[in-house]
UniProtKB/Swiss-Prot annotation:
Enzyme class: transferase
Gene field: arcB
The organism's taxonomic lineage, starting at the top: Bacteria, Bacillati, Actinomycetota, Actinomycetes, Mycobacteriales
PANTHER family: ORNITHINE CARBAMOYLTRANSFERASE, MITOCHONDRIAL, ORNITHINE TRANSCARBAMYLASE, MITOCHONDRIAL
Name of protein: Ornithine carbamoyltransferase
Family: Belongs to the aspartate/ornithine carbamoyltransferase superfamily. OTCase family.
Length: 315
């Protein structure tokens, strides 16, 4: 039997049906954290951080332990990634040691290069272009609060070219969510990501809307999402990342224009008083803390599902 290696490098690596399977499994694992133990042994998962992390590190390390495994955690400075050998060769070598590799890195092409040589699943724990594990947690959180995801209206406010906006488009429309990206002029999503999202939306019946009007964007929205205006590595890019974004802040006045039962999400860390106010972040419509917890459950489900694709043992 030919071994199937499935990677999760961007949100549309999962079909709508596969994404639904992962989210269903995440809900089950939240209720029964030790129900699946595919890494019993323990078997190893490589966890590589070239960007600093709090939630990603804690949630993956704990999740791997709950699945019976051992996380081998290293930072970019203590490896030779892309320096002494090709990333393809690194993928080949790591595949002989571990059952999966979780990597938080810079450019998406680095992930693609490693995956091209790997015989085990490569998981994007964040890249400059995408943050797909976070969006799985976002979708799990929305499903808990709203039930069916199909037809929900989600509005993201902020830098449309950052990894959260991109992943919300791809992952959102995969789930049948109508996604609106509201961003200042000059900060729209990358065109090739928009094209990919619209291609997936055509399959699911969802919609993608791009706008520079935050007031119109939030009217009737079921969920508002934001992220920091300055992502890691953009601190010295020379762009004004404050003034143009002020109208896109999620505050009580803007939230009042959304649906009465709208929820607010933020991947964290939050810059209080910038992209979101204290009143909203700590308010009754915020689901941010559930969202953060769900990183643990969604990522566990993803690993279980990916490992099952290799073994044929359906979770």
């Amino acid at each position: 039997m030919t071994t199937v290696v499935k990677h999760f490098l961007r949100d549309d690596d999962l079909t709508p049906e596969q994404q639904a399977e992962v989210l269903e499994l995440a809900a089950r694992l939240k209720k029964a954290p030790f129900a699946e133990r595919p890494l019993e042994g323990p078997r190893g998962v490589g966890v590589i951080f070239e960007k600093n992390s709090t939630r990603t590190r804690f949630s993956f390390e704990m999740g791997i332990a709950q699945l019976g495994g051992h996380a081998i955690v290293v930072d970019g400075r203590s490896t030779q990634l892309g320096r002494e050998e090709t990333l393809q060769d690194t993928g080949r070598v790591l595949s002989r040691y571990v059952d999966a590799v979780v990597w938080r890195t810079f450019g998406q092409k680095r992930l693609e290069a490693m995956a091209s040589g790997a015989d085990v699943p490569i998981v994007n724990a964040l890249s400059d272009e995408f943050h797909p594990c976070q969006v799985l947690a976002d979708l799990q959180t929305l499903a808990e609060r709203k039930g069916s995801l199909k037809g929900l209206k989600l509005t993201y406010l902020g830098d449309g070219a950052n990894n959260m906006a991109h992943s919300l488009m791809l992952g959102g429309v995969t789930a049948g969510v109508d996604v609106t990206i509201a961003s200042p002029e000059g900060f729209a999503p990358l065109p090739w990501v928009v094209e990919a999202a619209r291609a997936r939306a055509a399959d699911t019946g969802a919609t993608i809307t791009l706008t520079e009007d935050p007031q119109a964007a939030v009217v009737g929205a079921d969920a508002l999402v934001t992220d920091t205006w300055t992502s890691m590595g953009q601190e010295n890019d020379g762009l004004d990342r404050v003034g143009p974004f002020r109208p896109f802040q999620i505050n009580e006045a803007l939230l009042a224009k959304a649906a009465a039962d709208a929820v607010v999400l933020h991947c964290l860390p939050a810059h209080r008083g910038e992209e979101i106010t204290d009143e909203v972040l700590d308010g009754p419509q915020s689901v941010v803390w559930d969202e953060a917890e769900n990183r643990l459950h969604a990522q566990k489900a993803l690993l279980v599902w990916l490992l099952a694709q290799r073994t044929g043992n359906r979770p």
